[in-house]
Structure formats: structure tokens, C-alpha cells
């Protein structure tokens, strides 16, 4: 059996090593070539090293090796208090197993002592490596049902090996609902690692979402997990299954057990990114997004929902409830703009947006939304007065100027509407911005009624310089206008206290 020397050397040549935390012992597991597994098991006074390849089956009493697949082998070395013993087992051509036994460096006869040594250590090998788990799970379940399997898992000290048995149990055995409930409670109670809990659950979530009892047990199980990262993996894998609408909603609601808004968002986004998605699902996501604390992540979910081509009116209006929970003016604006660009919005949505603007702190973002609303002719004509009144809440004359200028230049206003806008201009504090607006509208060839309103607004300007600038801009138009306009021009001009500035405008009509 020349493979023995090679095996000893191979124990030190491994890549893709991963550390496995044991409950009471140090265990490391590695792969050397994708097929060969090496396990080192250190328990203070003793050390066991195991290397194997292929499929290995043990006898029903777990005291010997029943068979090894062609080309496979198992090498076991145990060192205790300085004494080293080794066993190498390989398959013969007739299907039997050939054993080699060594004490120290000397090969010994395969006799009763060797068989007893193998019988003494083989159960530890089994429970340390997970070798032969499929056959053992089948054997225990056939003889004693679920309890027999779980009793054996209780004897395993490694989460890594425990999850192997539990996964096989879920994959291969015809578990009823009571058994699934029991497994759901057992897994987080007996496995410390969220990673391995996830390995058990992630491919079998559809079984747990089949009934109310199993769903409740499953949700209680993932609530006991500390890592939102691993909870999100389980839930996203569940969404990949062919679940009913009711089960899918349960998966979405299960995301509430996570504290992390990031991971909640990844779960909701997983579903929203699907090509086919019923209104019921979108509506549920929108409702759940109202509980996302982070404005950034809430906005991601809401904008994805708005991108859906079949968003129902109910879901769309539920978006407004979710937006009401967004504190950031930046993210509120992002969501509102996505709404306005997504579809023809209802009156309720427009009214909610206008109401929400009253609570915004940022003049910049309030201005962005108001300008978008005025860009929609249907909205601006119906809600002209309401939108114009929102300008009063803007503290910055700079942003008020942006809005009022846009209205005067781009809206098809009647004379009454024009007067209302100029009333807002007259109420501004800054003479500079008043003049900016009035000079721009004078360049737009206003009619006589509009020109009269402009001159009246100019009367609200305190600065002689700025007042004269507006009157100079109106000079050519006033000369060919009505007596009423000329009289208004003279009336405003006479309020200029500076002879210099008065002289610049008096010649326009004298």
C-alpha cells in the first residue's frame, strides 16, 4: 500500500482552507484538489488527522468501514501523549476494503487490536468529518424517526458537520409539518453559527412556508439569528422558489425581523427586479417600505416600485403613505419627481405633494418640485392658486425668483393670473430679485393689462436705482400705451427721491 507515504505528505499541502469553529475543540477543514478533504482535529492532549476521497460507507454499528468507492481512500492518524497510530483503508477490486495499520513508523498486522482501535475512533471520525452522513441519516430516520436523527446530531460538536446532517434530513426524508416545526426550533437552538443555520434553511424555505404552523416556527427561527446578512440570504433564496402569493407575502413580511435597512432593501429589490410581478406583491412591498428608517433605502425601494409598468392605483397611493415617513428633503424630492414622471397622477397625489411641501425645510428642493408641477399643464392649470401660494413658504428670494419667472414666461396666464403672480413679486424682500423678474417679463412683450401690473409692482421697489431700472425698461412701451398706463408710470416715477434717477425716466413720457 504505497499510497500511505504520499498521504502523510499530502496532509501539509492544502489550499482553500477554511477554519471551522467547534463547540469545544479546534477543527480545521481544507481541500487540496477539489476532491480530497483533509481534517485536523485537536483536543489538547490528542490530535487526529483525517484525509479522504470518494464515497465511504460505514457498517451499521459504526465500528468499521463497509465500502469505499473506486479510487477513494481514507487515512486516519491519531496522536495521543506522543504515541501515534495510523490506519489507511482503500477499496479492492472485488469491493472489499483493504486496511493497513501502523504504530509509530512500523506497519503492524491487521488483527483484533487494529480492529478495536478502528472501532474506538471511527465514531469520532464520523462525527468530526460528516463522512457517510447520507447513509447514517437514512438509517437513524428509518429506525427512530426524526428524534433519532436529532439525538445523533446532539452528539456532534461541530456546526459544520451538524448542518450536513440537517440538510440531508430536509432533502431526503418525508418530513411532516410537525417534524418541520421541530426542526425549525432545533436548528437555531443547537447551531451557533448563522452561516451554517443559513446553509440548513436556505434551500428549503418553501417547505416551511407551506402552512401557518411551519411558517410561524420558521420565522421564530430566523428571529433568533444575529446576522441580517444571513437572514437576507435565506429570504432571497425563498423568493427564488415557486411560492404562492400568500407565501411570498410571508417572506416579505419576514424581512421585518432584520434591523438593517440595507438588507431589507436587498430583499424587496430582489422581488421588484422580476419581470413579472402581480400588483398584490408590489402593494405589499410599498406598505412594508414605510417601516424602513433610512430615507436613502426607502427611496431606493419606492423608486423601483414606481418603475413597475403595472403599478396599481392602490399601490401608487400607498406610496404617498411611505413618502410621508421620509424626513430628508432630498429623498422626498427624488421620490416625488419619480412619481410625477411615472404616470398621470391623481388629484390626491398632487394634493399630498403640495401638502408635504409645507413641511420641507429646503427652499432648493421645494423649488424643484414646484417647477416640476408647473411643467405639467394639467396640474398647473387646476392647482395654479395652490402652487402659487407655496411660494410664500420659500424663504429665499433667489428660489422664489426662479419659480415666478418660470410661471410668467411659460404659463399661459390670463390677466387675473398675471396679477396674482406679480402680487407675489411685490411681496418679496429683495429689490434686486424684484427687478430681475420685472425686467425679464418686460422683454417678453407684455400686453397693456400686464404692463400696468408690472408698473404697479415696480411701485413696491424701495431702491431708487432699481425702480428706475424697471421704468427705463418700460419706457418705449409706455410711450405708445394708454393714458392709464402713462399715469401709472408718472405716479411710480414721482416716488423716486433721487433727482438723478428721476431724470433718467421722466423724459420717457414728458
Tell where the protein language model's regions lie, with residue ranges:
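Bacterial N-terminal signal peptides
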Residues: 2-12
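Intrinsically disordered, low-complexity peptide-like regions
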Residues: 13-14, 395
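Boundary at the C-terminal end of the N-terminal hydrophobic targeting segment
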Residues: 17-19
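Non-catalytic all-alpha helical scaffold/repeat segments
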Residues: 23-510
Amino acid at each position: 500500500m504505497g499510497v500511505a507515504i504520499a498521504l502523510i505528505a499530502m496532509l501539509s499541502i492544502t489550499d482553500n482552507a477554511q477554519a471551522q469553529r467547534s463547540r469545544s475543540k479546534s477543527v480545521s477543514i481544507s481541500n487540496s484538489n477539489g476532491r480530497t478533504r483533509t481534517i485536523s482535529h485537536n483536543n489538547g492532549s490528542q490530535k487526529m488527522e483525517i484525509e479522504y476521497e470518494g464515497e465511504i460507507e460505514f457498517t451499521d454499528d459504526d465500528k468499521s468501514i463497509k465500502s469505499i468507492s473506486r479510487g477513494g481512500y481514507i487515512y486516519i492518524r491519531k496522536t495521543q501523549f506522543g504515541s501515534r497510530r495510523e490506519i489507511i483503508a482503500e477499496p479492492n477490486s472485488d469491493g472489499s476494503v483493504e486496511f493497513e495499520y501502523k504504530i509509530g513508523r512500523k506497519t503492524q498486522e491487521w488483527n483484533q487490536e487494529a480492529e478495536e482501535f478502528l472501532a474506538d475512533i471511527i465514531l469520532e471520525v464520523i462525527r468530526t468529518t460528516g463522512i457517510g452522513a447520507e447513509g447514517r441519516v437514512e438509517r437513524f430516520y428509518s429506525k427512530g424517526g426524526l428524534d433519532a436523527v436529532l439525538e445523533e446530531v446532539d452528539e456532534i460538536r461541530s456546526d459544520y458537520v451538524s448542518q450536513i446532517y440537517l440538510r440531508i434530513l430536509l432533502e431526503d426524508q418525508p418530513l411532516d409539518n410537525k417534524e418541520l416545526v421541530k426542526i425549525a426550533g432545533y436548528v437555531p437552538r443547537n447551531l451557533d453559527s448563522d452561516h451554517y443555520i443559513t446553509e440548513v434553511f436556505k434551500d428549503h424555505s418553501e417547505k416551511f412556508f407551506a402552512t401557518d404552523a411551519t411558517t410561524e416556527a420558521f420565522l421564530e427561527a430566523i428571529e433568533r439569528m444575529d446576522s441580517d446578512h444571513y437572514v437576507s440570504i435565506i429570504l432571497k433564496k425563498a423568493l427564488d422558489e415557486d411560492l404562492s402569493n400568500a407565501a411570498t407575502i410571508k417572506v416579505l413580511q419576514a424581512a421585518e425581523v432584520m434591523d438593517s435597512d440595507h438588507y431589507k432593501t436587498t430583499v424587496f429589490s430582489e422581488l421588484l427586479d422580476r419581470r413579472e410581478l402581480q400588483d398584490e406583491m408590489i402593494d405589499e412591498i410599498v406598505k412594508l417600505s414605510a417601516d424602513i428608517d433610512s430615507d436613502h433605502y426607502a427611496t431606493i425601494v419606492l423608486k423601483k416600485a414606481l418603475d413597475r409598468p403595472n403599478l396599481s392605483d392602490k399601490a401608487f397611493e400607498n406610496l404617498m403613505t411611505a413618502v410621508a415617513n421620509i424626513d430628508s428633503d432630498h429623498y422626498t424630492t427624488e421620490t416625488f419627481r419619480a412619481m410625477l414622471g411615472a404616470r398621470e397622477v391623481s388629484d390626491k397625489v398632487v394634493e399630498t405633494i403640495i401638502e408635504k411641501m409645507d413641511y420641507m425645510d429646503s427652499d432648493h428642493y421645494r423649488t424643484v418640485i414646484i417647477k416640476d408641477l408647473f411643467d405639467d399643464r394639467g396640474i398647473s392649470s387646476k392647482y395654479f392658486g395652490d402652487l402659487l401660494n407655496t411660494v410664500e413658504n420659500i424663504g429665499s428670494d433667489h428660489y422664489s425668483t426662479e419659480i415666478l419667472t418660470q410661471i410668467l414666461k411659460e404659463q399661459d396666464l390670463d390677466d387675473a393670473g398675471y396679477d396674482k403672480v406679480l402680487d407675489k413679486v411685490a411681496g418679496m424682500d429683495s429689490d434686486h430679485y424684484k427687478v430681475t423678474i420685472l425686467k425679464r417679463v418686460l422683454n417678453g412683450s407684455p400686453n397693456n393689462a400686464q404692463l400696468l401690473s408690472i408698473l404697479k409692482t415696480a411701485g413696491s421697489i424701495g431702491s431708487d436705482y432699481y425702480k428706475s431700472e424697471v421704468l427705463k425698461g418700460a419706457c418705449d412701451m409706455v410711450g405708445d400705451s394708454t393714458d392709464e398706463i402713462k399715469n401709472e408710470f408718472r405716479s411710480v416715477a414721482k416716488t423716486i427721491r433721487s433727482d438723478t434717477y428721476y431724470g433718467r425716466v421722466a423724459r420717457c413720457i414728458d
